[in-house]
Amino acid sequence: MERLQGLLLWLLLSPSVVWASRGPLRPLCRPVNATLAAENEFCPVCITFTTSICAGYCPSMVRVLPAALPPVPQPVCTYRELRFASVRLPGCPPGVDPIVSFPVALSCRCGPCRLSSSDCGGPRTQPMTCDLPHLPGLLLF
């Protein structure tokens, strides 16, 4: 009987193992281009710019049966290596710093979410937009 249960378990799992080995249905964690908005409440315009961010699927596990154990931490797609770039907001009055710095993803990894450096929320239904009048283009340096 034990042998039969083992065979049944193998038959149930083997098609999913073969299917799963063909690759994930979602793109894995990697740098992707994204358009972001930069503004300062003291400057008259908002600008958008394109940078690399980390995005994609990270394999995770969820307990099927309720347990007294704490939940399994879910990994998120986050920076492995990054550099910082800056944009200059035009039209800022004297005494207001017109420079906005932002991270540029060079490589990514799946790991724990660090709220100090990442937005660990899920995908947004609305893109981040400007509250101020929008000035297209970018001034990177």
Swiss-Prot record:
Keyword Transferase: no
Annotated GO CC locations: cytoplasm; extracellular space
Disulfide bonds listed in the record: 29-77, 43-92, 46-130, 54-108, 58-110, 113-120
Transcription among keywords: no
Annotated keywords: Disulfide bond, Glycoprotein, Hormone, Secreted, Signal
Major localisation: secreted
GO BP, one annotated term: G protein-coupled receptor signaling pathway
Listed InterPro entries: Cystine-knot_cytokine, Glyco_hormone_CN, Gonadotropin_bsu, Gonadotropin_bsu_CS
Signal peptide start-end: 1-20
UniProt similarity note: Belongs to the glycoprotein hormones subunit beta family.
Protein name: Lutropin subunit beta
Organism in which the protein naturally occurs: Rattus norvegicus
